[in-house]
UniProtKB/Swiss-Prot annotation:
This protein's name: UPF0434 protein Tbd_1506
Residue ranges of coiled coil: none
PANTHER family linked to this entry: PROTEIN PREY, MITOCHONDRIAL, ZGC:162634
InterPro entries, A to Z: Trm112-like
Family annotation (Pfam families): Trm112p
HAMAP family membership: UPF0434
Organism: Thiobacillus denitrificans (strain ATCC 25259 / T1)
GO cellular component: cytosol
Family per similarity comment: Belongs to the UPF0434 family.
Length: 62
């Protein structure tokens, strides 16, 4: 994930900062506990495409 892109992307639901989870190819919003998929290096920032994440995934290694 391009660090500059990560700086400007925010959660579409709460406008919070996102965390890049490289192993899962997802951008995670710790505030909403939603994970947005990254497909072919393109973040899919649609709430209907996000999945709920458990508390262990928010700041964990996922």
């Amino acid at each position: 994930m391009n660090p500059k892109l990560l700086e400007i992307l925010v959660c579409p639901v709460c406008k919070g900062q996102l965390e890049w989870k490289k192993s899962a190819h997802e951008l995670v919003c710790p505030a909403c506990r939603l994970a947005y998929p990254v497909r072919d290096d393109i973040p899919v920032m649609l709430p209907e495409e996000a999945r709920a994440v458990g508390p262990d995934e928010v700041h964990g290694q996922a």
